[in-house]
A protein has these predicted regions:
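Helical segment within the ABC ATPase nucleotide-binding domain
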Residues: 63-75
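Hydrophobic anchor residue at the start of the ABC signature
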Residues: 37
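Conserved ABC ATPase signature
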Residues: 23-27
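Catalytic Walker B motif of ABC-type/P-loop ATPase nucleotide-binding domains
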Residues: 48-51
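Conserved ABC ATPase "signature" region
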Residues: 2-19, 70
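Conserved catalytic motifs of ABC-family nucleotide-binding domains
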Residues: 44
């Protein structure tokens, strides 16, 4: 059954095995966030919109989510649109980005182009910004 295979893939991808018997109300904030994202993937979307997916997550969960985003884009061929204020976390897992300031685009391009952009540096990142 394709649906069962999809669910099993998501369980493995999001490392849900130890959590399968726990009710959602007892999950941590990061676990709940992963659950919501995984639920969006059940119906094989062509586009996935994530609003501040890295907010309030520990570093291990951020890294796992970054890897999932990269995998969704490269392997599953899903367009992932991420809106986030955490530039370092965001630029570590996307191939293109747009930087807004006061509702206007101030930079657009690959992560390496974005961090070199003088307007993005002065208004958003600062001179010492680096991607991990």
């Amino acid at each position: 059954n394709l649906r069962k295979a999809k669910i099993e893939k998501i369980i493995a991808q999001f490392e849900f095995d130890p959590l399968l018997e726990i009710k959602a109300k007892h999950l941590s904030g990061g676990q709940k966030k992963k659950l919501v994202i995984s639920m969006a993937l059940i119906n094989d979307p062509k586009i996935l919109l994530l609003d501040e997916p890295f907010a309030a997550l520990d570093i291990l969960t951020i890294k796992m989510l970054q890897n999932i985003i990269v995998s969704l884009q490269s392997i599953d061929k899903i367009t992932v649109i991420v809106c986030d204020h955490q530039a370092r976390d965001l630029l570590s897992c996307v191939d293109r980005a747009i930087v807004l300031s006061n509702g206007k685009i101030i930079a657009s391009g690959s992560p390496s182009e974005i961090i070199k952009d003088s307007t993005a540096k002065s208004e958003y990142f600062g001179d010492e910004f680096k991607i991990n």
